[in-house]
Amino acid sequence: MQTLAQTNNEKELIPKSFLQSGNDLPITNEIAFKHPLVQDIFDIDKEHLGLYSEDIYYQMINVFLTDPYTYMVFLDDKGIDYESTTPFEVFCLLFVEYMEKLINISKPLEDDSFGILIKNNIYFRAFSFFFGVDSFYIKQEQDGKKTLCYDDGKFLLNDDVYNYVMEFVKRINGIPEGERINPEDEWAKQILIEDERERLKKHALKHKDDETNTNRLGNLLSTITWTCNGGVTPFNRNQLHIYDLVDGIERTSKLLNYKNTMIGVYSGCIDKKKINLNELHWAK
């Protein structure tokens, strides 16, 4: 299947200029991955006047964040080595398991309620929001590889294109690459997995009753509105693409750091010889 996704074997690099264009990410001639406006995110939960829009949005982008390293415990429980699988394979495993659980708990429901529950599951909502397709399914190709399809077999995603999408999701939402440990051997790897298992258990107990909204989007909007040069206001900020919001805050932070450092240099508190002004510059 010919796609428009251009990938790099080492890393799915997407030019910063493209991110700033606000364009959707092209997948095929018929399908693109949405680069949402802030208003698009607000509109996710129109039923409740946007009250839960932010929570739902971050649940939806989490659907596409399936780094095997992050899911090492989940994979280990299935007898899968996280170093030998791909993000797309993890996505497929999570989707299948999620749908099986959803179907099982939905069995006592009437047909109408069952249909609504299936239609509104987080995977289908995410693909409807970002791709504009109501549902999708996993197709096993003759070579054993999996493909995501929609409608009557139209191509949506495969292993390579999924990496492209995952990179786009992380870039436009300002999600950094997490730190990781590279174990020397299988013994060290198993220790790492068990340590992660314990961390997840403690995290689950600690946050069991914690339903506090982190308000990340709200904090980003507040920051860009009141610390930028005045171009972003309460009256136009909803028309920013999500990457503009993230990039604007990062650029403002660099500018403030540059100004504060230069004040330190001019006042004699910082030795100019010990800093790299080119790397420090806010326009880099």
Residue ranges and their predicted role:
Residues 97-210, 214:
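Hydrophobic, aromatic-lined core segments that form the binding pocket/scaffold
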